[in-house]
């Protein structure tokens, strides 16, 4: 009873540890635990809701400085007066738009998801990236191949 998927996950977790990327390693180890225990019954829910929950947690992390007062309102207001901040705002809008296209593409062309996931894991593990890659990558792919 050789489980190729488990072997792939273990290899990716090892890659995460070797590259000192605990985000990848811990995430994959959690998925391995889910896979080899009765928790595997939750995979359909994780697959359906995981992305939304991840985006919510990411948004909480990004918005926390505003909510805590670490980033004062005056700094936010000044961000509309500085050209570098305006560039950051424009890039944020573009990247968010790409992410939206990416979600649509991932839902409509599931055959691309494996490539996007492998590319993201490699980018996170080898280049110290962060796992927001699949959405942005899918958005970029949608510009090249179309949403269809």
UniProtKB/Swiss-Prot annotation:
Keywords: Cell membrane, Membrane, Transmembrane, Transmembrane helix
One Gene Ontology term, aspect cellular component: plasma membrane
UniProt-listed InterPro entries: UPF0756_TM (IPR007382)
Bilayer topology term: Multi-pass membrane protein
Superkingdom, taxonomy of origin: Bacteria
Annotated transmembrane regions: 14-34, 51-71, 86-106, 121-141
Subcellular localization, as worded in the UniProt entry: Cell membrane
Acetylation keyword on record: no
Family annotation (PANTHER family): UPF0756 MEMBRANE PROTEIN YEAL (PTHR38452:SF1)
Family: Belongs to the UPF0756 family.
Entry protein name: UPF0756 membrane protein YeaL
